[in-house]
UniProtKB/Swiss-Prot annotation:
Signal peptide boundaries: 1-24
PANTHER family, alphabetized: V-SET AND TRANSMEMBRANE DOMAIN-CONTAINING PROTEIN, V-SET AND TRANSMEMBRANE DOMAIN-CONTAINING PROTEIN 2A
Protein name listed in UniProt: V-set and transmembrane domain-containing protein 2A
Organism, scientific name: Homo sapiens
Subunit structure: Homodimer.
UniProt subcellular location: Secreted
Amino acid sequence: MMGIFLVYVGFVFFSVLYVQQGLSSQAKFTEFPRNVTATEGQNVEMSCAFQSGSASVYLEIQWWFLRGPEDLDPGAEGAGAQVELLPDRDPDSDGTKISTVKVQGNDISHKLQISKVRKKDEGLYECRVTDANYGELQEHKAQAYLKVNANSHARRMQAFEASPMWLQDMKPRKNVSAAIPSSIHGSANQRTHSTSSPQVVAKIPKQSPQSGARIATSHGLSVLLLVCGFVKGALL
């Protein structure tokens, strides 16, 4: 009897394990993130969806930025692929976590949205799914590459704004404000000198006709007195 009971328990255990493994093998990504090529300034979306093969305690999706193009190995820009993660692997050492979504159920999806993408956003992104069953955690991941092309118009505008504006005298634009007041002051000083000159001339005394008449009269009296003196001397 004891042997039959042990056989029965073993059969039930392996049956449950087989069913669980069969259901777990049905867990899959229903939507893989795709490689995206965008131009600077555009809005970018990456979609990721996962379906569990059994009743899960919870499902969780995390979006990660793994590394930029300078850190990638040759051929790392290939199509997204599903890869199992090791349980003892430290995910924080793999990149930067961007967002997390957690639900109770068998299906989960999450879109990564990047508005006004820039060149520094280029690189490898990863969708990580944690499937929490009773007594165990299963992790899955899928990757996609974001390629960002430079916006030539934006680059030209940045270069134009960064370069100094040169004038005809080969001085930077920032010196224009200093040059203008000096020229204004110089012209103002010239106007001051030109307007002050008549004032200096006006201070020089001028002889009026009356003063000239007085001078002529005094000379005439002197001559008359001199003549009278000569006549008086002759008569004596």
